[in-house]
A protein has these predicted regions:
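Non-catalytic interaction/regulatory segments
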Residues: 2-191
Length: 191
């Protein structure tokens, strides 16, 4: 199915979900995908929908769902991938963290020091996790809002550049977390 047509008639999330079902997801992961797919594609810009085929989008969504399965409380998880089957010349930067202000701007600034950003997809989903950080469910009212960020960027040259970018993003997000957590105290001190 043509991804542009699918995006126009709002069926792409259903098509991608069907692709994920073919992959034999567990019932728990399938329930997560049913919540995540609409949230993810609601944040895909119309001009970006053509970047991938439905099968490629399913790989992106499935990969993100797998990546989201474990996250320590109060910490961001970050990865940089350069999959062979994506657009030539692109790497994927993916981040899952507590939802808070300044995330996209901060990550974009770090990336822009050496690479160009081609697409940003940023759904916010309610995630319920156990004490060890394992994902229990998505959606509903239990849990807390988490930012799931998917950046398509210029291809990182090698594993060393991927690791360097990952470390820079992690450090910047720790600074954001500290600033957001301290803003009220800083404001009170300034007044």
């Amino acid at each position: 199915m043509n991804a542009t047509i699918a995006a126009t008639d709002h069926s792409l999330p259903s098509v991608v979900l069907a692709e994920l079902q073919k992959g034999g997801l567990s019932p728990q992961r399938l329930a997560q995908a049913e919540v995540f797919c609409p949230a993810f594609f609601a944040r895909v810009d119309g001009s970006d929908i053509h970047l991938h085929t439905p099968v490629q989008w399913a790989a992106v969504v499935g990969g993100l769902l797998g990546f989201m399965q474990q996250r320590p409380a109060g910490r961001a998880v970050v990865r940089v991938l350069s999959p062979a089957d994506m657009h030539a010349g692109r790497s994927l930067l993916q981040i899952v963290t507590d939802d808070m202000p300044f995330l996209i701007d901060t990550v974009s600034m770090v990336v822009s020091t050496s690479l160009q950003t081609h697409a940003v997809i940023h759904p916010v989903v309610v995630a319920s996790r156990d004490a060890a950080g394992a994902l229990l469910s998505l959606g509903g009212t239990a849990g807390q809002a988490e930012s799931v960020m998917h950046f398509e960027i210029d291809r990182a040259a090698d594993a060393a550049e991927q690791e360097q970018l990952k470390a820079q993003i992690e450090a910047a997000l720790e600074d954001v977390r500290a600033a957001v957590n301290d803003w009220a105290a800083m404001r009170d001190k300034a007044l």
